[in-house]
Amino acid sequence: MRLNFWLAITALVVAAVHASTLTPSVLPLIVRNPYLSIWFNHARGYPWANWPMFWTGSTVGFAVMAAVPDSNTVYPLLGRSQDFLGRSSSYNVSFPKYHGASFDASTTNLTYTIKGTDLKITLSFLSPITPTSTFRQSLPAGYLTAFVEGSHDVSIYIDVNGEWVSGNRKNQIVWNFGKSTSRSSGTPIKTWSIRRQDEQLLTEFNDHAEWGTIHVSAPAGVEHQSGEAHHVRRQFAQDGSLKNRVDETFRGIFEEEPIFAFSKRFKLSKKSNSSSAAKDSVRFTFALTQDPVAQFAAARGLTQMRPLWASYFHSAEELIQYHFDDYETATFLAHNYSEQLAKDAYASGSRDYQDIVALSARQVLGATQFSGIPDSPLIFLKEISSDGNFQTVDVIFPAFPFFLYTNPRWLEYLLEPLLEHQKSGQYPNEYSMHDLGAHFPNATGHADGRDEYMPLEECGNMLIMALALANAFKDNPRPTFSQTPPEEAIALAAGPVRLPNSVDAYGMDRSFEEMGTTGEKAAVEWLARSYKLWKQWTRYLVEEALVPANQLCTDDFAGPLPNQTNLALKGIVGIKAMSELAALIGEKEEAKYYGFVAEEYIEKWQDYGLSSDKSHAKLSYTWRGSWTTLYNIYADALLCFHLPEDGSSLDNGRFWNTKQAPIGGASKPHFIPDKIYKAQSDWYYAVLQRYGLPMDSRHLYTKSDWEFFAAAVTSKKVRTEILQHVAKWVNESTTDRPMTDLYDTEGTGHFPGIYFMARPVVGGHFAFLALERACGGKAVEGLKFLDEAEPTDIDVQESLMADMARLEEPPRKMGEL
């Protein structure tokens, strides 16, 4: 039974070879958190042309080779090992035929054939996304499986160096070689463990962690060797094998560069026959263990936070063994997620959309660290590559559609550190904080209140995410993805913490019902715990949202601007969200009040924020002849304020029975009128550029997260056009780092002088997928009117000039607004 299951899993993994059509410039290999983040750069070229890289672009020593004894030839497969081989009478160096890369949400496959043979080699890198197993998602580890097929003998080799454990290449490293003891249910394995000689806890150098140990494991039957890079790689090239020797002279990362290698020989010639080629594989695992993972100014004070996995295992060795043996289950769950994601993306967008969200998924989770305890997990998030802040609210916000789609509870675990810290009184301002700390992994807070000043932005973000999460708990209490592990799943052994209520014996998340509650009860309880904060932040919005002061929005690189139309909309939708939050926990009078304020503000906002011909939203109330991508309108649809007109008025809250008094005595079918959705959809169609939708009229650069927020609430035709333009950028972009969210929509699609890379905000690419699940599946139905007519033909220049012509009119006094 286990063999059949293994064959089925193998077929699933290799099938991913055919799963992608786009050709991004960089692909994820092993990406689990901000410090275990290995990428294939220049991914449109040969994998042996460059070394793999850390997300910053710095190289990482990681080589894979194949040796064919019949011809005494060694073939570099990944990394520039050929630079170390030189010329020799003992072996030949050649390159395989490379058939390209393919990927799904969890897997990247590189496929090769060897000239003059029937050998086929697939390197399959798996960083499993397991939405129904938070336990597995928390494991800081990934897999490389080498699949071989043919009738010729072949050996596979891998090595790593000290660049995995320090950004300062002058540092000294130490290492250990160990073997696990055979267990009744465990696979005997060998492990290289490498770390800095003098670790610096919770410290970074060029964004690399300066503490922690990388563990590289393989089955006990493989050969191993450590030593100077030239010597070890030439040893494999010469013999197709290693000497099972350990270099015990600790030294610097590039001091007679020590590397740590495994090799595996496959006797395929003895297994194949005339009717079929032999197939085999070898698995390697890579785990970066760090304890602590962060320090956090929690309610109890500054605390060194342990990794979540430490609640399940007594030691790193236990973690490594379980992870190695759990490959089949992790693969099964990851494939289930990838397959469902592909189906949903194709149904709602296109084949290109499949690839874009698949490419984005690991990047989102690559910014996270899982901490806390099993019944109260926390997810910490690094604002990768921009400021490096800890738990940045306006980075979580663009990423949150990914979490709503994948596992809404993970969004709860992201928001909880922000709520706990602010409820404890450690943040002095009345508005929501921007982040928990100036630099990850240190969430020491901002007791002086001098974090980056984005008060309106962050208050709106927190309230919108709070209601979206509550709705998700209520409407979709059970995840779409598989909650049943395969029969071969390995039960968790007794760990330091007794088996939690939220996790079953096989590490699968329990549903709300299995935990003795319901999604709606869980939503109410979660909201009630922080109700004081929700009210506090809404008071700020009531005072400041309608006419925003000169302040930053999340797009802070563009600078501050007063009267921002899009920012005001976020604040007003945030007030509307508060009316629903209040209603959900039974505060009916407050719900009515905030609902009334929101309705009054949205009426005025339409007057202030739209162009004179009502064809588009202005960048700023007072900036005539400007336009903006109105991405914050997405929240209106996501929060169920724009449901189909089926006889039930939206003036009735979704969670309470008292009717809100309508503005002006007339019932409104929608919070934001259809005409604004239609106008923006048509406008986007008119201003599209070669590589997508510019952010606003100031520049030709764009933010891909906001492109997808905007596209989610346009007509299908416009959405398809935006997707196709972004897909064209993915295929043609000259950017050479993990997918940027900020790029030029013209020229070469390069960075616009600001280098964003590997940021979790690409979770915004899931905006339409999250919208399809919102409101019990009814959110997208409320937007079907957009498909009833073709986009209106707009003369953009004429519209902008007409708006500017009104500059001669007396300006409105903002004090009278």
Positions of PLM-derived features:
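Fungal secretory targeting signals
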Residues: 1-19
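C-terminal capping/lid segments that line or modulate ligand- or cofactor-binding pockets
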Residues: 22-53, 455, 462, 622-645, ...
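An extended acidic
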Residues: 27-118, 207, 216-231, 236
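Well-ordered alpha-helical scaffold segments within catalytic/enzyme domains
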Residues: 37-41, 64-67, 112-114, 148-149, ...
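Long, well-ordered core segments of solenoidal/helical folds
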Residues: 165, 364-372, 408-429, 470-474, ...
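Extended ligand-binding clefts on enzyme/binding-domain cores
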Residues: 188-244, 385-395, 401-408, 420, ...
